[in-house]
Amino acid sequence: MRKRLMAMLQNDISLQQQENALAKQSAKFHSKIAAKHQLIKRQQRKLEKLNQVANERKEDQENRSAFEQSMRDKLLREQQNLSEMQTELATKKQRRDELMGFVRTMSEATNTYINLKALPARVKGVALRPEQGEWIPFNCDAYDLKGLNALWSRLNEPSASTDKWQQLFSAEPTAKEKENANASLSSIIEIDLTSPTAHRSLAKMLEK
């Protein structure tokens, strides 16, 4: 009986020791699990911060790319506008150069001198008639067809250049050009070339 009690006591002691060992292992395991959880949480917070930074950088990059594209588009439009302006200016310059050359040629051929500085807005100058001993100053709006026709009728003389003068002064103006037209043909004044002041007046007329 005593041996049996001693054996039972030993078993109880052994079980108690095993339980204590298991309890220690369990506590150690739970401690490690808790430490792992804390580590995971810290890593998650770091990951969230990294993701936030990455998203901000991505957004900045997208904004920068959009801005760069916008600037490229704007630059392209400005280059196109500049190219169109250069083409338009070149066309206008060519047309003006042709007109100036034509006016010079016709002036020499018909003794009619045009103030080139007044073109293209106005037709201003003087027509010489040496055989009559007179000169006729004129100043009219370049788009005033009635005034130009009156001028042409007044200055019209038999000449091989008549058709060219009519072609020069009979082009139909645009609506905008008509709106911008100023006064009609100024009064035509005949002045005797033999007058003492005729040549001085002629020089002043061509300079204006």
From Swiss-Prot:
Write out the annotated subcellular location: Nucleus; Chromosome, Centromere, Kinetochore
* Keywords, comma-separated and alphabetical: Cell cycle, Cell division, Centromere, Chromosome, Coiled coil, Kinetochore, Meiosis, Mitosis, Nucleus
Q: Which domain of life is it from?
A: Eukaryota
Tell me a GO cellular component: Ndc80 complex
Q: Does the keyword Hydrolase apply?
A: no
The yes or no answer to whether the keyword Iron-sulfur is present is: no
Q: What is its main location?
A: nucleus
One of the protein's GO biological processes: meiotic metaphase chromosome alignment
Instruction: Report the coiled-coil segments.
Output: 31-101
Q: How does it assemble?
A: Component of the Ndc80 complex, which is composed of Ndc80, Nuf2 and Spc25.
> Into which family does the record put it?
Belongs to the SPC25 family.
The protein's role, per its UniProt record? Acts as a component of the essential kinetochore-associated Ndc80 complex, which is required for chromosome segregation and spindle checkpoint activity during meiosis and mitosis. Required for kinetochore integrity and the organization of stable microtubule binding sites in the outer plate of the kinetochore. Participates in SAC signaling that responds specifically to disruptions in spindle microtubule dynamics. The NDC80 complex synergistically enhances the affinity of the SKA1 complex for microtubules and may allow the NDC80 complex to track depolymerizing microtubules.
Q: What is this protein called?
A: Kinetochore protein Spc25
Give the organism the record lists.
Answer: Drosophila mojavensis
Gene giving rise to this polypeptide: Spc25
